Amino acid sequence: MAVTKAKKIEVTEKLTEDFKKANHAIVGTFNKLTVSKDYELRKAVRSVGGKYSVVKNTLAERAAKGTKIEDAVKGLAGVTSVAFTDGDPVQLAKVLSKYAKDNPEYEFKAGVVDGKVIKLADIDALANMPSKEELYSKLLFLISAPAQRLVTVMNATGRDLAVVLNQGVEKQKFSGGEAPAQ
């Protein structure tokens, strides 16, 4: 059954809308992917706030005109799928890299991060990076650690004095008795 021109226009408009919202995308291809594996991939991409579409190459090129994804979808051949997000590109890359390792029939064609086309090797490097949340927590720790150490040192002086006084009282060195002989 042939797809009507109206349906193609509708698909192109929806893709254009999605591509304009997306800052990051990973273009892939697959061979002999089963329905259950495709569903698994879509579910994984949705779990990190992304969208996944299998698209015709010409429709993808038309839809991507004037968007950040335009350079990544130029001149595509074969079966093409696009996973895109306006959220964290690291999470998307992690999900797709894990899926590609588990399913050799899925391969990367191109990637876009913040509107810049990245190499295929960079997709794996992106997947190995910590997520934004992990980076924020590490940064917060690095910022708070010196202040925490300062408070510990400041408290140590008072604590050490209290320990010395307590030991003196326990050994009765501070009892108002006679002075030691000189």
From Swiss-Prot:
InterPro entries: Ribosomal_uL10, Ribosomal_uL10-like_sf, Ribosomal_uL10_bac, Ribosomal_uL10_bac_type. CDD domains: Ribosomal_L10 (cd05797). GO terms for cellular component: ribonucleoprotein complex; ribosome. GO terms for biological process: translation. Keywords: Ribonucleoprotein, Ribosomal protein, RNA-binding, rRNA-binding. The keyword Lipid metabolism does not apply. One of its GO terms (molecular function) is large ribosomal subunit rRNA binding. The keyword Amino-acid biosynthesis does not apply. Forms part of the ribosomal stalk, playing a central role in the interaction of the ribosome with GTP-bound translation factors. Part of the ribosomal stalk of the 50S ribosomal subunit. The N-terminus interacts with L11 and the large rRNA to form the base of the stalk. The C-terminus forms an elongated spine to which L12 dimers bind in a sequential fashion forming a multimeric L10(L12)X complex. Belongs to the universal ribosomal protein uL10 family. NCBIfam families: PRK00099.1-1. This is Large ribosomal subunit protein uL10. It comes from Koribacter versatilis (strain Ellin345).
